[in-house]
């Protein structure tokens, strides 16, 4: 059973990871820095809530403070079915705390998303297991996994 979970997570990671073409791989001297950085959620494993830190625009060395990045963060189960859209914790720039991270425009900076462990906007708690969270910033997708343990 453990092997099946490992194989499934490896397959999902390979499917969701951004692909690098051979032309991009050859041009290492002129490669741009990533638009975003997705950190591991904490605590992990968790019950019933977690936080997901991420940074946008090369934070802390933001070169263009006026640029607004289109950000979406989603949580999926292992079948890649949408489970929830976390909310931004606190507030930063022009983004209010508690706002769902779905096509939100944010400036360069460091942020923390909050997920209460429920399915969507319901009070039904997510089942124990592995979940995948995907951050999309201006078309760049970053993926990581987390564990809900009851």
Over which residues does each language-model region extend?
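Sec/Tat signal peptide C-region and signal peptidase I cleavage site
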Residues: 19-23
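Bacterial N-terminal signal peptides
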Residues: 9-17
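Short loop/turn motifs at secondary-structure boundaries
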Residues: 25-150
């Amino acid at each position: 059973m453990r092997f099946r979970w490992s194989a499934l997570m490896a397959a999902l990671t390979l499917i969701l990871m951004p692909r690098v073409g051979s032309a991009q791989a050859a041009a290492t001297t002129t490669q741009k820095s990533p638009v975003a950085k997705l950190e591991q959620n904490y605590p992990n494993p968790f019950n019933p809530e977690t936080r997901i830190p991420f940074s946008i625009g090369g934070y802390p060395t933001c070169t263009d403070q006026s640029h607004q990045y289109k950000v979406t963060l989603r949580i999926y189960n292992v079948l890649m079915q949408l489970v929830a859209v976390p909310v931004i914790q606190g507030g930063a720039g022009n983004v209010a705390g508690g706002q769902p991270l779905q096509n939100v425009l944010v400036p360069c900076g460091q942020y923390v998303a909050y997920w209460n462990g429920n399915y969507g906007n319901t009070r039904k708690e997510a089942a124990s297991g592995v979940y995948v969270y995907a951050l999309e910033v201006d078309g760049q997708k970053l993926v990581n996994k987390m564990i809900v343990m009851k």
